[in-house]
């Protein structure tokens, strides 16, 4: 089932689209289950869910965009748990509006340790 939400309940501009299963939980096996929009109509955020749990086996389960369309953030989840993207354990990457990496978050599930690397807009590590 697809539900659309508009500002002030009127069709002034689309603010969110939800895809729900028969139990009313966010669910879409073929794309994002929740999409939010800027007033301009451009996509602000896409969230992937299966049976109410943030989940995407083929990429990030959370994608945020700047209004200019550039990626703001990728975050990886499987079954509502943070899931490392690769053997380096990257779970979240955030970008500046110009497209350069701002922040990388790594998580080791075995040791429960996190590592955060922050960059300035020139690409130099600051933390």
Language-model segments: what does each one mean?
Residues 1-127:
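Glycine/tyrosine- and acidic-biased, solvent-exposed loop/turn segments at the edges of beta-strands
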């Amino acid at each position: 089932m697809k539900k659309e939400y508009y500002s002030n309940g009127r069709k002034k501009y689309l603010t969110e689209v939800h895809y729900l299963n028969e139990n009313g939980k966010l669910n879409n096996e073929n794309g994002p289950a929740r999409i939010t929009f800027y007033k301009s109509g451009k996509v602000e955020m896409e969230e992937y869910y299966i049976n109410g749990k943030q989940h995407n086996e083929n990429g990030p389960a959370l994608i945020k965009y700047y209004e200019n369309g550039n990626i703001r953030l990728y975050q990886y989840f499987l079954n509502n748990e943070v899931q490392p993207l690769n053997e380096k354990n990257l779970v979240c990457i955030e970008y500046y509006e110009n497209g350069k990496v701002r922040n990388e978050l790594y998580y080791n599930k075995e040791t429960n340790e996190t590592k955060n690397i922050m960059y300035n807009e020139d690409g130099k590590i600051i933390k």
